[in-house]
Amino acid sequence: MSRLNPRQQEAVNYVGGPLLVLAGAGSGKTSVITRKIAHLIQNCGIRAQYIVAMTFTNKAAREMKERVGGLLRAGEGRGLTVCTFHNLGLNIIRKEHARLGYKPGFSIFDETDVKALMTDIMQKEYSGDDGVDEIKNMIGAWKNDLILPPEALENARNPKEQTAAIVYTHYQRTLKAFNAVDFDDLILLPVKLFQDHADILDKWQNKVRYLLVDEYQDTNASQYLLVKLLIGTRNQFTVVGDDDQSIYAWRGARPENLMLLKEDYPSLKVVMLEQNYRSTSRILRCANVLISNNPHEFEKQLWSEMGHGDEIRVIRCRNEDAEAERVAMEILSLHLRTDRPYSDFAILYRGNYQAKLIELKLQHHQIPYRLSGGNSFFGRQEVKDLMAYFRLIVNPDDDNAFLRVINVPRREIGSTTLEKLGNYATERKISMYAATDEIGLGEHLDSRFTDRLARFKRFMDKVREQCAGEDPISALRSMVMDIDYENWLRTNSSSDKAADYRMSNVWFLIEALKNTLEKDEDGDMTVEDAIGKLVLRDMLERQQEEEDGAEGVQMMTLHASKGLEFPYVFIMGMEEEILPHRSSIEADTIEEERRLAYVGITRARQTLAFTFAAKRKQYGEVIDCAPSRFLDELPPDDLAWEGNDDTPTEVKVVRGNSALADIRAMLKR
């Protein structure tokens, strides 16, 4: 989009106070944010180092930074901060760690670490870990709401909350002892720091002269307060959001934060972006009519100049197998007729469990696909091993990292030895790593085991010393060679080819660390800082990003589709108790499910189809399914219903298979 429309231009130019840009789906909000940053630097005299733009994903931050770079002259963007909320929080903690009582090089615990630590606490305190996931979620919710352990304990209303609050108390104490933080702490700790230390708050407010926040409807209580504290009394900010696309209440997001802005900033200006640059008028009318069933503080109507468009198809299928077969055949047929690449097609669904059947059908028809939510790069065992070594180098107090690497490769140090080492370290109030070469450990362990532990510590101390030198990357490469990790992989992989692939991931990780160090603009980043950034990237990018333009039908949940767009979209499982989800019906939170359907609809550029099954297997029984209430809320004149006649879907599928066999035979000539 080379030129801005009048509403977009208004949002870019306004710098007279607080601004809310209510940006509908596909309305060009990224263009507004990036042009506004350029406008602030080039026309308003605000230096880039005093501008901070925050979003929720690394991918969005990267795209934003690249687009801003294309608008600025050389050197104009130096010092500009475009990052995620959690990256900003990490930077604040890194710079203010002493005031928070942390040592340099603190660790960031990922989901696996957090669950392992909570499980350990529950087994010690309650002789079992039943309900650890529920307790983990409760503690996460408390942190998002800025509730610390004493307050959680005081306000516990039932035995379950009391148990969670006690675990929370032990958990925070242990985290601090490990010199570690978790993902939620990256927001909680900066907020508490700013609230308790006016001098630090003043320092950071002076660093942030203008603040921009994307996807504001996804902020939780702690993120809202972090923004409010950074803004202070200056009131120079632009937030961009869409109340109709708030679909993350389950992880603490509060769409009401958009309404709170009007109370907290009475002079707030609101600019609505309603022109859509993505979808046909018909698709947008369906989206507008559907979402109008939700109550609104801000009324908006999306419109476009992309043509009227085809009818929206609603396809009834006899059962879930026929539904999956129908979608696969529709995609194959459209691909053959239009010659459009498979990557132009998206299959969206409410839950990952729906993917298996359609995946099998796509495989059967030899249709390539990309399944979002697969194994992440950082989730691979070899990468987790090396990351644990990195973490131990950065933070010798990280017991979780120590326990992961002590026997990778095998060092003949058994669980009994480690248990005795752990008990000794707890008595001495030191880390397990620090305890490995203490003389007093000999009173608890045979000399064979103390020698092995001390040998490991000497080796790691040497690596740490080398990493503090001029070439830490070479030191890490040497470490991998010295522990003979490649041989360990060959012993523990299904084939030499698998071992080679896993080893290539190890070298790739070290190269990523090298790139992080080399890209540091300020030149003051240490290897510890670079590892901290990698650990954070691990958590922010749980799934490996697909390469651009990857061939294959895109399969993903409705939640994962947010922010994406495709020419052809199929939304499967449009049934009561699937969309809307059963739990939402029971909890009377239908509005969020409606927003989820709205997000799905507005992913489509040209063609949209809904499918649902008349019957579905559930717990071994065949049940009747009711079409989703959301289908009844759509404008009937824009819908074309199919599959309501008496012809069995299976017969149609056989006919379709026969026709496609003929086409394939013709193509092979």
Give the label of every model feature segment:
Residues 2-13, 17-21, 32, 52-53, ...:
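Conserved helicase NTPase motor core
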Residues 24-25, 56:
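P-loop (Walker A) phosphate-binding loop of NTP-binding proteins
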Residues 1, 638-669:
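Acidic, low-complexity intrinsically disordered tails
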Residues 157, 341, 355-367, 380, ...:
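Conserved helicase C-terminal RecA-like lobe
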Residues 50-138, 151-155, 166, 259, ...:
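Conserved P-loop NTPase-based nucleic-acid remodeling module centered on helicase motor cores
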Residues 27-33, 97, 266-269, 274-368, ...:
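Helicase P-loop NTPase motor core
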Residues 40-56, 339:
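Conserved SF1/SF2 helicase motif Ia
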Residues 31-47, 63, 67, 228-230:
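Walker A/P-loop NTP-binding motif
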